[in-house]
């Protein structure tokens, strides 16, 4: 099973050239990512008892969902020019460092593993203390870029 991400609309490195439909789809996916992050934050605040049980990260499906959506945005930014260089450079290192984990999370959602040991566990992904802040910076940067483009287009439409 494979997934396809249609990122061909933004070819010159800017959301500015994305069609209205493309921007609407990006905003929809951003909303899903934001909702998944909020759900994960609630689950994280409630805590969990970590032990060696592979099911110990059972409540954190929202984390995998959030990461899978960030993965799509990250690949679109790095490989297909979704963000302008000005928007990408501040998060490039965070994005490049996060992408392997994001891809592993996406894979977990689209391919059912043969055993529980084959998937990345939330506790392992967060243990270093850097992963979660890095993901939040990436998340915030994509959200800000999309909001700015959306507002810019709304203002442009009022000027007509």
Tell where the protein language model's regions lie, with residue ranges.
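Amphipathic alpha-helical interface segments
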Residues: 1-101, 116, 121-160
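Long, charged low-complexity segments
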Residues: 103-114
């Amino acid at each position: 099973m494979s997934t396809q991400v249609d990122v061909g609309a933004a070819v010159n490195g800017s959301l500015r050239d994305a069609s209205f439909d493309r921007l609407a789809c990006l905003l929809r996916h951003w909303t899903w990512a934001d909702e998944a992050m909020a759900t994960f934050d609630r689950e994280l605040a409630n805590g969990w008892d970590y032990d060696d049980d592979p099911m110990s990260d059972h409540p954190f499906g929202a984390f995998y969902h959030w990461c899978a959506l960030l993965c799509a945005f990250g690949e679109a930014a790095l490989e297909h020019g979704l963000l302008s260089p000005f928007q990408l450079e501040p998060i490039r290192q965070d994005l490049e460092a996060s992408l392997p984990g994001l891809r592993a999370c996406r894979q977990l959602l689209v391919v059912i593993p043969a055993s529980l040991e084959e998937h990345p566990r939330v506790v392992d992904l967060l243990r270093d203390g850097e992963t979660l802040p890095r993901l939040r910076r990436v998340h915030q940067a994509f959200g800000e870029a999309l909001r700015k483009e959306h507002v810019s287009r709304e203002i442009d439409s009022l000027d007509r």
